[in-house]
Design a protein with these regions (language model features):
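Alpha-amylase-like alpha-glycosidases and glucanotransferases acting on alpha-linked glucans and related
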Residues: 1-65, 71, 77, 84-197
Length: 199
């Protein structure tokens, strides 16, 4: 088979570097990455059925929600397929997506059926830049205006497993500098705020 393995972050050769996700593999969701990412969803790829069954297994166990890491690296059509079916049987389920491309936010909310998206490249990055003295607080205005129509579906946070701890020397040297950002992040709107405690 060529390639013998593709990493989760789309590396298609046998020599991934230290920044590649060499410990992951790319599942076949019906996208041909060697043919301009052409989509082949008819018939439904077997991966869609199997992954939906895995989510259903955990829903049957009483899980109330899923955080979908790097959801945008999986076709939005799959999420529509899976989440539509799961929410029909388990309407209480909450799905949170990690999507870093703001141009795709509405697509993953409306077509993908996600309840919430991480607001990482918007509010988090802006607040961090303000806290660290790299941006003016005026930057916050354009940040929230860009997602005003979907703000209730954005999950705010000040730290998670991918980001440095606020209390670390690498963030702003002093955790108390982040208190204004905490107030903004929790009070800016009625959307949820994630308190990081291992998620």
């Amino acid at each position: 088979e060529s390639p013998a393995k593709a990493t989760g972050n789309d590396r298609f050769d046998a020599e991934p570097n230290k920044n590649d996700w060499y410990e992951t593999i790319k599942l076949n969701y019906g996208v041909n990455y060697f043919d301009n990412r052409s989509k082949h969803f008819d018939p439904i790829p077997d991966t869609w059925v199997k992954m939906t069954d895995i989510l259903r297994y955990w829903a049957q166990k009483g899980i109330d929600g899923f955080r979908c890491d790097m959801a945008e690296m999986v076709p939005v059509e799959f999420w529509n397929y899976a989440l539509s079916r799961l929410k029909a049987d388990y309407p209480h389920l909450i799905f949170i997506a990690e999507v870093y491309n703001p141009a795709e936010y509405r697509n993953y909310l409306h077509q993908g059926k996600f309840d919430y998206l991480y607001d990482k490249v918007g509010l988090y990055d802006t607040l961090r830049s303000v806290v660290c003295g790299q941006s003016s607080a005026f930057a916050i205005t354009s940040c929230w205006q860009a997602i005003d129509d979907i703000r209730s579906h954005m999950l705010n946070f000040l730290e998670n497993h991918d980001e440095q701890r606020i209390a670390s020397d690498f963030f702003a040297t002093n955790p108390f500098k982040a208190l204004p950002a905490l107030v903004v992040s929790t009070c800016l709107s009625n959307n949820p705020f994630m308190v990081y405690a291992g998620q």
